[in-house]
Amino acid sequence: MIWHVQNENFILDSTRIFMKAFHLLLFHGSFIFPECILIFGLILLLMIDSTSDQKDRPWFYFISSTSLVMSITALLFRWKEEPIISFSGNFQTNNFNEIFQFLILLCSTLCIPLSVEYIECTEMAITEFLLFVLTATLGGMFLCGANDLITIFVAPECFSLCSYLLSGYTKRDVRSNEATTKYLLMGGASSSILVHGFSWLYGLSGGEIELQEIVNGLINTQMYNSPGISIALISITVGIGFKLSPAPFHQWTPDVYEGSPTPVVAFLSVTSKVAASASATRIFDIPFYFSSNEWHLLLEILAILSMILGNLIAITQTSMKRMLAYSSIGQIGYVIIGIIVGDSNDGYASMITYMLFYISMNLGTFARIVSFGLRTGTDNIRDYAGLYTKDPFLALSLALCLLSLGGLPPLAGFFGKLHLFWCGWQAGLYFLVSIGLLTSVVSIYYYLKIIKLLMTGRNQEITPHVRNYRRSPLRSNNSIEWSMTVCVIASTIPGISMNPILAIAQDTLF
């Protein structure tokens, strides 16, 4: 009898929860329509996987890519609509959030074709891989629009859990297991520190969780200049720092880059930074409005350490992926300049523009690494020597992406850095910009060192890996080539494209 009563209560409680969720989706679903498209794509993937065999693998790629493209289309149709706060204040929709969501969707759309050949060659499980990628994308999108502390914590955890699973996807690889373990342990520790900072904000504001209400609560309780705010600021900076991976919170980055499957590294290298940057701008700009001098100082220290350590250590690396890991640490230092400047001197606009270029430069480079690695089985920089003699197209495209990452004119990376540094200079960040300029010169050195290896024509310097290198017989139909071509074109866009891109970015400012 007791069991029947408990069972009935469980069914009633479950029904109430389901009806509440359905009610929220019915009345607020239009505000998260791009996210709903991805959720539908996830459900469709699971249904097809449970009812079909491995011969339907092309459908998995098609469904994933189509759902991402449709989500991008939904975002574009919603452009310039009035800002809306939905789900009882948990989620905010505005142009600023949507531009970051667009960047995350763009990353995922380019990463899926980049992964096709790798998955087929390594015989990885395709459905789970795509499910993790789409779920991580979904978590990143919700993080961009998060408007309260709970959503800001849950959304990145959704992204992080999928990231842990993706980084350890090749479970028979010892390096992958090591990378996943370090990633998981440090991620769990950083999440705990982040929640600790949120608890201070919650208590000091009188029990508020919405970002704007926290500011009002701090004013009402007169706690906006209390020592507790400093503790909250430091804790939250450490928590977000793990996601952005600036120095000294970068310890996980080189190992995860080296041990994880290369398409996974390509995905994580850009999406995590875009989502974390979107979250950082809102958290620092709204709840810590009265502590702007303090968080500016903290971010300046992180930017300087990242630009110096990232670029100097990258010079000494022999692995291509580890070199890009330290390079990405230096790159996030440049992005932090835009966060510090804020919207007063087009800091956010320049940051968004540079991140758009960084996506194309970084994914283009990783597309070349995937292609070369599948045909040679090596990641050592020395093994790229003489690649131009065997595959000029691959060598030239890799060289263009590396030069753009270094910021050489007239490539897109140069104009992105130029505008970012100019905004920093106008805001009075003279020392920070000077460090950025010097470290950019350092980065050009190690990029040019790789390009010199690519273009060498002396037989004694050509490695056995390149001598035995075979070009893809299906080059025109190769999905990696498609993704790489898009990235290379975007990386070499001349400066004439800067004005319309900046104008769009400036329209997003909240």
Swiss-Prot record:
EC number: 7.1.1.-
Biological source species: Muilla maritima
Record GO terms (molecular function): NADH dehydrogenase (ubiquinone) activity; quinone binding
Keywords recorded for this protein, A-Z: Chloroplast, Membrane, NAD, NADP, Plastid, Plastoquinone, Quinone, Thylakoid, Translocase, Transmembrane, Transmembrane helix, Transport
Annotated GO biological process: ATP synthesis coupled electron transport; photosynthesis, light reaction
First-tier enzyme category under EC: translocase
Self-association state and partner proteins as the record states: NDH is composed of at least 16 different subunits, 5 of which are encoded in the nucleus.
Protein name: NAD(P)H-quinone oxidoreductase subunit 2, chloroplastic
Annotated catalysed reactions: a plastoquinone + NADH + (n+1) H(+)(in) = a plastoquinol + NAD(+) + n H(+)(out); a plastoquinone + NADPH + (n+1) H(+)(in) = a plastoquinol + NADP(+) + n H(+)(out)
Protein's job: NDH shuttles electrons from NAD(P)H:plastoquinone, via FMN and iron-sulfur (Fe-S) centers, to quinones in the photosynthetic chain and possibly in a chloroplast respiratory chain. The immediate electron acceptor for the enzyme in this species is believed to be plastoquinone. Couples the redox reaction to proton translocation, and thus conserves the redox energy in a proton gradient.
Record's keyword annotation contains Oxidoreductase: no
Family: Belongs to the complex I subunit 2 family.
Coiled coil: none
Membrane topology: Multi-pass membrane protein
GO terms for cellular component: chloroplast thylakoid membrane
Location in or out of the cell: Plastid, Chloroplast thylakoid membrane
Principal subcellular localisation of the protein: plastid
Taxonomic superkingdom: Eukaryota
A Pfam entry, by short name: Ndh2_N
HAMAP family: NDH1_NuoN_1
Lineage: Eukaryota, Viridiplantae, Streptophyta, Embryophyta, Tracheophyta
Transmembrane segments: 24-44, 59-79, 99-119, 124-144, 149-169, 184-204, 229-249, 295-315, 323-343, 347-367, 395-415, 418-438
